[in-house]
C-alpha cells in the first residue's frame, strides 16, 4: 500500500505510516448528509480512506443551506441531498472513491431494513448522522457486529448532540495515546516485593508521563541485570512524578547504577456492548457517560432523558421531529421526560442520582430546537465522528460508548419571547434558536481574520454559512501571505490541486463565496506587522467587530493581541498540533489576553543578515535555499502572472506595498522577467541568472 508522502505529510507525522496505510484501506458509509453528515464526510475524505459512500435520499430544503456547505439554492426541492453534494465531496480528494449508495425501496419495512443491512457488509465503518427508529439502529448494529463493522451513531439537535460508538466485542487498540514513546534515565531500583524505580529527574525537567497500565523495558542496568532481558516487559503502577513500581524484584540481583527505562506499547482488547444492551444498562453506574463539561453536574443524564423523549415523539409521529419552536410539541416531550425523571427518582436508580433537580428549560430547549442544524455544532460533532472513524484502525481509544454535550450557555441572555419568526431562508435554523435580532447582528458584522490555513479555512466556512458579513457595507477580511502547497490539501479543505502556488487567502475567500454567495469576503496577502500599519491602520481596526487569530507564529499572535487590546476588540485565538487543539476567547479588560499567558519566544526566526552573510548551521543553508527558491520560482513568478492576467489587481497591490523603495524593487524585478520572456534567447537568460546571482 503506497501513501502519498507529499499530500499526507502532516497526517503521517501525526498518525504514523502504519496507521495511514490502515486508513487508506477503510471503506466508510455515512447515512445522512445534513450539517453533521457533510462535516463528517469532508473530514474523513481529507484523511484518505479508500472509499466513502453517502446515503440521504431526502430532497434538499432551504434550511439545509445553513449547514451543508456543498448544497446550493439551485438544489432546493429538486434533488436529493446525497446527489447534491457527492460531486463536491469527491473533489476534496481525488484518491478517494466517493459515491451515493443506492438502496431499492421495499413495500415492507422489514424487507427494506434487511436489504439495507446486506448493503453495508462491504464497509469497515458505518456512520449514522440522522435520528433513526430504534428498530432500524438495532438491526443495523446487529448486522455490523456480525461482520466486525464499526458503528458510529451521532446526532445534532439544535445546541445539543450525542455520539454513540459500537466497535464490537473484540476491538484491538494498537496505540492508546498516539504519543511518542517515553524514555528515562534510572536513578535507583529497590529490591523487594514491590520494586520501586526512581528516575533521574534533572532539575525537574523530565517528570514521568506514563501511568498505571503502561509497560516499560530496561537496558544497560548494572547490577540488577535481570531487567535487561529484551523479551521481558513490566506493567507499571504510578507512584509520583519521579517513581513507579514494577512488581516483585526481591529475587533479582542488587541494583548498582545506570540504566535506561523506555516505554513500550502493547495491543489491548476493547469490548463494546451493542446499542440495545448499552441502552438497557443506562442506569448501571459501572457504565458511566463521558462528561465533556465537568461544570454541568447532572446535565448529561438529563440530556439523555431529553433525547429519549424526542425519540419517542419521533416514533409516535411517523418519524417526524417536533416542529421548530412548536411549543405544543415541546411541552408534550417535557411532560413525558418529567414522568421518566419522577419514576427514576422513586425507584432510586443510582445512575440518575447525579441529577440534582429537574431543569425543565434544558429539556424544553432540546425539544423545541431538535430539528435545527446549527453550523458550529455540526462542525464540532463532525470532527468527533471523523476522529472515531480513524480510531477504527486501532489508533487511539474509542469513545466509551456515549458522549453527550450541549452549548445552551450561548442562549442564556436571549429572551424566551424573542422574535423567532422564520423567513423561509437558509438561516431559518439559526433564527429558530437565536432569534431575528441576533441574526441581524450576525449579518451586520465586520470581521478580520489573520491566517487562512487549516483553522482559518474552518473559521471561514463557519462564518460564511452562518451569514456573517452579508449586509450591505460589511466585510470579512482574511489575510495570509502564504501560498498553497500540496501538503495543505489534506487538511485545508477550501483548496484544490489546481490552486497549488496561488494565494491561500484569495482562494479561500473565493471558495467560501461559492458556498454562500451573499457572504462579503475579501482575501488579502499583506502580512500583519509594524511595517504594514499604513494598511492596517487605526481606521481599519476601529471598524472591525471581531478579530480572529489563525496564525502559527507566537510573534504574530503577540502583535495582533496588542492591537486587539489597543482597539478594545473581542477576539478568539486558536491553534492545532496533531490531534490536539487549543482556543482562547479574548475580551479586553475582562479576560486574559494572549500576551498575558504567551510563552517567551525562545526560537527566534533566523535574521536575514545571518542567512545571507554568516550561515554557520545546516538550518541556515536550508532556510536560505528555501527562501531563494520561493523568491525566484514562486513569489516573483506569481507577481508576473498577476501582471498579465489581472493588471488592475497587480497595480492595486503594488500601491499597497508601502515604501516607494519596495515598490521600485518590485517593478525592477517585473521588468527583468518581462525582458527575459520577450527576448527568449540563451544568452539573455544567462545574463539574467548572473545578474540575480551577483545581486544576491
Please provide the spans of the model-predicted regions.
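Adenine nucleotide-associated cytosolic modules
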Residues: 1-696
Amino acid at each position: 500500500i503506497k501513501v502519498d508522502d507529499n499530500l499526507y505529510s502532516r497526517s503521517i507525522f501525526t498518525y504514523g505510516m502504519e496507521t495511514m496505510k490502515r486508513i487508506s484501506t477503510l471503506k466508510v458509509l455515512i447515512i445522512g448528509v445534513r450539517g453533521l453528515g457533510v462535516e463528517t464526510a469532508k473530514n474523513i475524505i481529507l484523511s484518505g480512506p479508500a472509499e466513502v459512500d453517502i446515503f440521504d435520499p431526502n430532497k434538499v430544503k432551504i434550511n439545509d443551506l445553513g449547514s451543508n456547505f456543498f448544497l446550493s439554492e439551485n438544489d432546493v426541492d429538486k434533488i436529493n441531498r446525497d446527489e447534491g453534494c457527492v460531486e463536491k465531496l469527491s473533489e476534496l480528494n481525488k484518491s478517494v472513491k466517493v459515491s451515493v449508495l443506492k438502496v431499492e425501496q421495499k413495500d415492507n419495512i422489514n424487507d427494506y431494513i434487511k436489504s439495507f443491512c446486506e448493503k453495508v457488509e462491504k464497509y469497515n465503518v458505518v456512520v449514522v448522522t440522522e435520528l433513526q427508529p430504534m428498530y432500524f439502529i438495532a438491526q443495523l448494529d446487529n448486522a455490523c457486529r456480525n461482520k466486525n463493522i464499526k458503528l458510529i451513531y451521532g446526532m445534532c439537535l439544535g445546541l445539543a448532540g450525542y455520539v454513540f460508538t459500537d466497535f464490537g466485542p473484540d476491538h484491538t487498540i494498537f496505540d492508546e495515546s498516539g504519543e511518542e514513546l517515553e524514555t528515562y534515565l534510572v536513578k535507583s531500583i529497590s529490591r523487594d516485593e514491590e520494586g520501586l524505580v526512581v528516575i533521574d529527574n534533572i532539575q525537574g525537567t523530565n517528570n514521568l508521563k506514563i501511568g498505571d497500565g503502561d509497560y516499560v523495558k530496561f537496558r544497560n542496568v548494572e547490577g540488577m541485570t535481570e531487567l535487561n532481558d529484551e523479551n521481558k516487559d513490566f506493567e507499571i503502577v504510578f507512584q509520583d512524578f519521579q517513581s513507579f513500581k514494577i512488581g516483585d524484584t526481591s529475587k533479582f540481583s542488587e541494583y548498582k547504577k545506570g540504566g535506561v527505562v523506555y516505554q513500550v506499547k502493547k495491543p489491548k482488547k476493547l469490548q463494546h456492548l451493542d446499542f440495545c444492551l448499552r441502552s438497557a444498562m443506562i442506569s448501571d453506574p459501572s457504565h458511566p457517560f463521558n462528561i465533556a463539561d465537568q461544570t454541568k453536574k447532572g446535565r448529561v443524564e438529563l440530556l439523555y432523558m431529553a433525547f429519549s423523549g424526542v425519540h419517542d415523539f419521533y416514533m409516535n409521529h411517523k418519524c417526524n421531529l417536533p416542529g421548530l419552536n412548536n411549543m405544543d410539541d415541546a411541552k408534550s416531550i417535557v411532560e413525558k421526560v418529567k414522568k421518566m425523571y419522577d419514576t427514576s427518582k422513586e425507584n432510586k436508580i443510582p445512575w440518575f442520582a447525579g441529577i440534582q433537580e429537574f431543569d425543565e428549560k434544558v429539556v424544553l430547549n432540546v425539544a423545541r430546537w431538535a430539528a435545527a442544524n446549527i453550523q458550529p455544532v455540526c462542525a464540532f460533532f463532525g470532527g468527533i465522528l471523523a476522529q472515531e472513524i480513524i480510531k477504527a484502525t486501532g489508533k487511539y481509544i474509542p469513545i466509551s460508548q456515549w458522549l453527550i454535550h450541549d452549548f445552551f450557555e450561548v442562549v442564556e441572555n436571549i429572551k424566551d419571547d424573542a422574535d423567532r419568526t422564520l423567513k423561509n431562508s437558509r438561516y431559518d435554523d439559526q433564527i429558530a434558536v437565536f432569534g431575528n435580532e441576533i441574526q441581524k447582528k450576525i449579518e451586520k458584522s465586520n470581521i478580520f481574520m489573520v491566517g487562512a490555513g487549516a483553522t482559518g479555512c474552518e473559521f471561514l466556512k463557519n462564518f460564511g454559512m452562518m451569514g456573517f458579513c452579508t449586509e450591505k457595507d460589511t466585510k470579512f477580511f482574511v489575510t495570509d501571505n502564504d501560498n498553497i502547497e500540496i501538503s495543505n490539501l489534506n487538511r485545508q479543505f477550501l483548496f484544490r490541486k489546481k490552486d497549488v502556488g496561488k494565494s491561500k487567502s484569495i482562494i479561500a475567500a473565493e471558495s467560501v463565496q461559492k458556498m454562500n454567495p451573499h457572504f462579503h469576503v475579501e482575501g488579502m496577502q499583506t502580512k500583519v506587522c509594524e511595517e504594514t500599519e499604513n494598511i492596517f491602520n487605526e481606521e481599519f481596526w476601529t471598524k472591525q467587530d471581531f478579530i480572529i487569530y489563525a496564525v502559527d507564529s507566537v510573534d504574530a499572535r503577540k502583535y495582533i493581541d496588542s492591537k486587539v487590546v489597543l482597539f478594545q476588540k473581542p477576539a478568539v485565538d486558536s491553534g492545532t498540533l496533531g490531534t490536539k487543539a487549543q482556543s482562547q476567547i479574548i475580551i479586553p479588560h475582562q479576560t486574559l489576553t494572549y500576551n498575558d499567558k504567551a510563552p517567551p519566544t525562545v526560537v527566534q526566526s533566523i535574521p536575514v543578515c545571518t542567512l545571507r552573510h554568516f550561515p554557520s548551521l545546516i538550518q541556515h543553508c536550508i532556510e536560505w535555499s528555501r527562501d531563494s527558491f520561493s523568491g525566484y520560482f514562486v513569489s516573483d513568478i506569481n507577481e508576473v502572472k498577476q501582471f498579465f492576467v489581472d493588471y488592475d489587481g497587480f497595480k492595486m497591490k503594488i500601491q499597497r506595498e508601502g515604501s516607494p523603495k519596495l515598490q521600485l524593487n518590485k517593478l525592477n524585478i517585473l521588468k527583468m522577467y518581462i525582458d527575459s520572456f520577450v527576448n527568449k534567447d540563451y544568452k539573455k537568460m544567462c545574463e539574467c541568472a548572473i545578474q540575480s546571482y551577483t545581486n544576491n
